[in-house]
Amino acid sequence: MADMQNLVERLERAVGRLEAVSHTSDMHRGYADSPSKAGAAPYVQAFDSLLAGPVAEYLKISKEIGGDVQKHAEMVHTGLKLERALLVTASQCQQPAENKLSDLLAPISEQIKEVITFREKNRGSKLFNHLSAVSESIQALGWVAMAPKPGPYVKEMNDAAMFYTNRVLKEYKDVDKKHVDWVKAYLSIWTELQAYIKEFHTTGLAWSKTGPVAKELSGLPSGPSAGSCPPPPPPCPPPPPVSTISCSYESASRSSLFAQINQGESITHALKHVSDDMKTHKNPALKAQSGPVRSGPKPFSAPKPQTSPSPKRATKKEPAVLELEGKKWRVENQENVSNLVIEDTELKQVAYIYKCVNTTLQIKGKINSITVDNCKKLGLVFDDVVGIVEIINSKDVKVQVMGKVPTISINKTDGCHAYLSKNSLDCEIVSAKSSEMNVLIPTEGGDFNEFPVPEQFKTLWNGQKLVTTVTEIAG
């Protein structure tokens, strides 16, 4: 009896230690108030590991950096928690219809918009590249609606982030290692998510085959509905009983019909002979008495929904900006201006040109770098740039260097003419996802010769590696 008592006490102590460890783990993950994980689906537990690993590291470093990066990280964290709630729902409930599914995804979609809007509202931020990296890739949270290839979709978003994280690395690699660690932590979220999707949701979000149809998100850290699916809707009322009289009538009519059919040719004996004076095409007088001929019923067409025309929302015009903010020249929202000039520049200053339309800008002196973003029909003339000139998300841009520039980068741009000076003939032209690019080389007579930048390539496997060459289209 004493041995049994000792065994019970040892078991109780062991259980107590396990509960303490479990509680500490939950507190560490920040989900102590979330539903119990004892019965959580394996892919929910795996997602929790992702939250406790790279996500927690990203949040920690973002908090150390502070400012806009920390605020942005908190928004990302909210989006990930909403995604976890959807995973809990999917693990317990069946997939709803398409229109209901969009309602379930709405909170995640709204959070994605909030993250993107934060970047747009803080274009003057000193940490704008950090915000852009997050904003360009946060749509990866939408993988839950992507089928049958959610994994490649996340990779595409991750690649979009790297365009800006490379800038962060270039700016901080010799200045502050904390920002380098931030880049590694943030990108690891999406690489880990790709591995997670490959293991649990290869062709799309895996829904439960049993349980009620999902109606709302469950598994949120707080809220009365956390951890359980909504109760199933009540069954539809039974159809009204069919009248026995109508049943007997239909049965009798059907029997009569088959009886007449079974008569064979003898059924024609009951038909009356129609003489010529009874035929309308033989007797015009009878045709005149018969009145207008009725047309048959029109084929069914679904009624068009009557929608009241919604008034067009007046787009708010942003104020034009031309100012020096710290070490950044901001040129924004300029339209139909042909004489903009920036003078008194310094080597450490940069220029950011955003949303300018049909505008010409001249930058005098030597400057660190120039970025042209989301501009149309922009003419840019500058003297010297020691770093890089970047053209992003723009259309019909003309750039002329009077002095020297080492690199011109063209990304997601349709129509770009780069006029080089004699001192810039060794300039590197780097392009991606762009079209109608031309480089103009000066001649001895003062004119320019135009050379198109290749847009079409051919790639072959030579047995050891891929070899890519330019493909020329024969005209």
UniProtKB/Swiss-Prot annotation:
Q: Which SUPFAM superfamilies match?
A: C-terminal domain of adenylylcyclase associated protein, N-terminal domain of adenylylcyclase associated protein, CAP
* One protein family per Pfam: CAP_N-CM
User: What is one cellular component GO term in this UniProt entry?
Assistant: extracellular exosome
| Region of interest: Disordered | 216-237, 278-319
List every position bearing Phosphothreonine: 307
Q: Which GO terms describe its biological process?
A: actin filament organization; activation of adenylate cyclase activity; ameboidal-type cell migration; cAMP-mediated signaling; cell morphogenesis; establishment or maintenance of cell polarity; modification of postsynaptic actin cytoskeleton; receptor-mediated endocytosis
Q: Where is this cross-link: Glycyl lysine isopeptide (Lys-Gly) (interchain with G-Cter in SUMO1)?
A: 348
What is the top-level taxon of the source organism?
Answer: Eukaryota
* Positions carrying N-acetylalanine: 2
Molecular function GO labels: actin binding; adenylate cyclase binding
Q: Where are residues bearing Phosphoserine located in the sequence?
A: 34, 290, 295, 301, 308, 310
Residue list for modification N6-acetyllysine: 81
Topology relative to the lipid bilayer, per the entry, is: Peripheral membrane protein
| Location of this chain's protein in the cell | Cell membrane
Record's family? Belongs to the CAP family.
Function description: Directly regulates filament dynamics and has been implicated in a number of complex developmental and morphological processes, including mRNA localization and the establishment of cell polarity.
What is said about its interaction partners and assembly? Homodimer. Binds actin monomers.
* Listed name of the protein: Adenylyl cyclase-associated protein 1
Lineage here is:
Eukaryota, Metazoa, Chordata, Craniata, Vertebrata
